[in-house]
Amino acid sequence: MSVAQVRLKALLFNDTSSENHHGCQLVMRQIFTLAGQVGMDIQRSCPMHHDWQTDIDLQRDIRAADLCLVNGEGTMHDDAPLALRYGALARYCQEHDIPCFLINSVWQNNDQLNADAHCFTKLFVRDTMSKAALADVGVSAEVVPDLTLSYQHTASNSLRHGMLVNGSVIDERLLEAWRTVKDRQDLRYVSIRTLAPLQLGKGFDFYLRKNLRKRLKALRRIAASYFYSYPAHLPAPLIDRLRWRYAVLSTHRFLNLLGRSRGVITGRFHLVTLCLVTGTPFFALPSNTHKIEALLAQVGLAERLKPSYEQAVNAADRIAFSESELTSIGSFLQETRMQAEAMFREMAQIARAANTPDQR
């Protein structure tokens, strides 16, 4: 068997598939798909909040792995505790000569974490702003956009109709979105929530039990959400129930809903990416990092960023994509898929080179 055919033992960190979110689940699906295409076998996939530093068995598996992948989604900013944990992982891998790659990541407002950035074998960030932040501390990175954008959606031929409004990870923004929907009869609220998948074979025995508990808890919340009314001025305790009340649980149905709508107004990054994937016109509001602004700048859609839901709704008659925007989006998605595939090929090549007899 040639070196290029040897299967690589990979460990994945920050598996977000249990986070009740269509975007997170699609990211993980794409990571497993792209890794498999280049001969990476992800033997263990570490849940988002599992601490590798207290898991002796996992540390042993790290030292025996051919490479480690860190999904930076939602973590590598503001010196967050999870960010520092993955920075320490990169340092640990470096000490034990295990290639460690950061993928699918933002990088913003870090100080302590910057000290560990150079420990990653290579960093692949989602946007040019993150690349610039790393360059400011002397660390090079490559830009590969969010991995949801590498997903190829089969568009339906049905006519688009209806406007969808989605909230934000920021509660104040979500409340603003809900007030806007309640004031208009022509708007439909939709949540990006979904159920945690039931899954086995990811190298952590508690995965199935954990996700089963999460599913049962979520199903109870979904059922309860239908027994509440949701006034325009929504009390904070009802925010979680609102998200479940307007969830579309199937990713396939959710993407088809986007694909049938005339447009979407959202403050969530992954709903922006899924609008791009489904070819759905949208207006976006800023989120908790620069991720939305940076993505829109990359695609050439910076003018689709709006300061408020009210202003976005007032501009809804101009939400349709222009021909030049459609061309830019098509080119961007094609390039993104190529970049994602090239990123995994490069990581596999580096790991194989590091595992040749004269290197290990």
Language-model region placement:
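Active-site anion-handling motifs in enzyme catalytic cores
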Residues: M1-R360
